[in-house]
Amino acid sequence: MNFKYIVAVSFLIASAYARSVQNDEQSLSQRDVLEEESLREIRGIGGALLSAGKSALKGLAKGLAEHFASGKRTAEDHEVMKRLEAVMRDLDSLDYPEEATERETRGFNQEEIANLFTKKEKRILGPVLGLVGNALGGLLKNLG
């Protein structure tokens, strides 16, 4: 009788353990699905914010470029215009990196290409925003 009892208890323990392992696997897979869904939502929100920010910066840069293109330009205005064009290229390269690289390298010699990529590595969002802020400040100063 003791042997039957030990076998029955062992069988119950084994089946309970198997059920708990199966439940753990199901809860882990459900957790993974939920985490993946939340990551997709976060990426979607981040992508939407980035897209809105890029669109706003592109619109602002185009407006400033049109303003500088319509009137007489000083050397300083010409430099600001060149920087705005560089900002526009950088923003386009965020959307289509392969096409932007191809477009940027057309018509340049090798030294200019090397300088372009060296400069591009040094560029970060802070200086771009500083440039746009300075351009807006100069524009408001000229208008005011």
Swiss-Prot record:
Source lineage: Eukaryota, Metazoa, Chordata, Craniata, Vertebrata
GO biological process, one term: killing of cells of another organism
Serine amide: residues carrying this PTM: 70
GO cellular component terms attached to this protein's record: extracellular region
UniProt similarity note: Belongs to the bombinin family.
Tissues and organs where the protein is expressed, per its UniProt entry: Expressed by the skin glands.
Pfam families xrefs: Bombinin
Modification type Leucine amide: residues: 143
Signal peptide segment: 1-18
Record protein name field: Maximins 10/H15
Propeptide span(s): 19-43, 74-123
Principal subcellular localisation of the protein: secreted
Subcellular location: Secreted
Keywords, ordered alphabetically: Amidation, Amphibian defense peptide, Antibiotic, Antimicrobial, Cleavage on pair of basic residues, Cytolysis, Fungicide, Hemolysis, Secreted, Signal
Its biological purpose: Maximin-10 shows antimicrobial activity against bacteria and against the fungus C.albicans. It has little hemolytic activity.
